[in-house]
């Protein structure tokens, strides 16, 4: 059985990812492990982890990495925390594949940790412009 880890951090990914998650969950050849963090775990962003759980998905690992604020210090602390958390997950769980969606800046520490742990990465989508996003300034 192949262990497929999927990282998600914002509500907008859920609608795009969920059909794939359902297919993986239904296939006995795969073990789906959801790595949920960021805005999904924050009340002011809707605590959207509850939507994922309500649809019957179990969460393998919660990643509470967001520091309050969007200044360079808060962003640096957030991304550093995420890299430590997800790096630990990769070392302990050794997934066969990591799936990510989009091109948000919080994916940088995720893919770096996966690369350092020799976890292959499946990248879905990217390149869209999000007004005001740090990578589009």
Please report, for each region that a protein language model flagged, where it lies by residue:
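Conserved nucleotide-sugar phosphate-binding/catalytic loop shared by glycosyltransferases and other
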Residues: 31-75, 85
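Short helix-capping segments at alpha-helix termini
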Residues: 25-31, 56, 116-119
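Active-site and donor-binding regions of nucleotide-sugar-utilizing enzymes
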Residues: 7-8, 14-23, 65-137
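N-terminal subdomain of nucleotide-sugar transferases
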Residues: 1-40
């Amino acid at each position: 059985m192949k262990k497929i880890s999927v990282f998600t951090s914002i509500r907008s990914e859920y609608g795009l990812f969920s059909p794939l998650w359902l297919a993986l969950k239904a296939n006995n050849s795969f073990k789906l492990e959801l790595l949920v963090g960021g805005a999904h775990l924050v009340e002011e962003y809707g605590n959207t982890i509850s939507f994922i759980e309500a649809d019957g998905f179990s969460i393998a690992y919660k990643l509470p990495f967001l520091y309050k604020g969007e200044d360079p210090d808060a962003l640096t602390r957030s991304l550093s925390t995420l890299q430590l958390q997800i790096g630990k997950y990769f070392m302990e769980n050794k997934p066969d594949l990591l799936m990510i969606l989009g091109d948000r800046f919080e994916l940088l520490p995720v893919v770096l940790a996966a690369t350092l742990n020799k976890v292959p990465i499946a990248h879905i989508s990217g390149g869209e412009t999000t007004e005001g996003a740090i990578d589009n300034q």
